[in-house]
Amino acid sequence: HFKNIQIVFNPEFLTEANSIEDFKNQNRIIIGGPRPATTKVRRIFAKAFPKVPIIKTGSTTAEMVKYFTNCFLATKVSFANEMYEISKALNIDYDKVTEYAVYDERIGKSHLNVPGPDGDFGYGGHCFPKDVMALKSLAWELGCSPRMLEATDSKNNDIRTNRDWETQIGRAVINIKD
């Protein structure tokens, strides 16, 4: 019935709080799928975002880029929260520690605020928790041992009070006009 349908995977890298601005100011666009379909989609994006790199790849690679990004940032949040706890135990200013640490450009400034933008510790929302759990599950199915993802998830479960993702199961589409 559907042999002429070609599906393209285009992961978004948006934050819930700034989704429209994030969309307008993308730093890259990933398009995964069969070549004829990705070529058509690339043309559409190239007109709207002429200065943004557009990367065409396979669907699985595009999906893994999304998981990699979200799981890396979730791990960074868990790590930052742990450094916050240690700084607090040493009676030193965590904000000064991060201010001086990010002089090393390899670290990057994002995702180091503790508590986070919602005033809670750890990460919430529906993307990071969902993606960490999904990639952990996939890794186990593939015979891999996702110890880092296990630690990230465990740390978050220990420190996060607002477990908002538990009430957002199945939420994938929002109406941005409201």
Specify the residue positions occupied by each region the protein language model found.
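Internal alpha-helical scaffold of NAD(P)-dependent oxidoreductase catalytic cores
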Residues: 2-11, 15-110, 138-145
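NAD(P)-dependent Rossmann-like dehydrogenase/reductase catalytic/cofactor-binding core
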Residues: 88-178
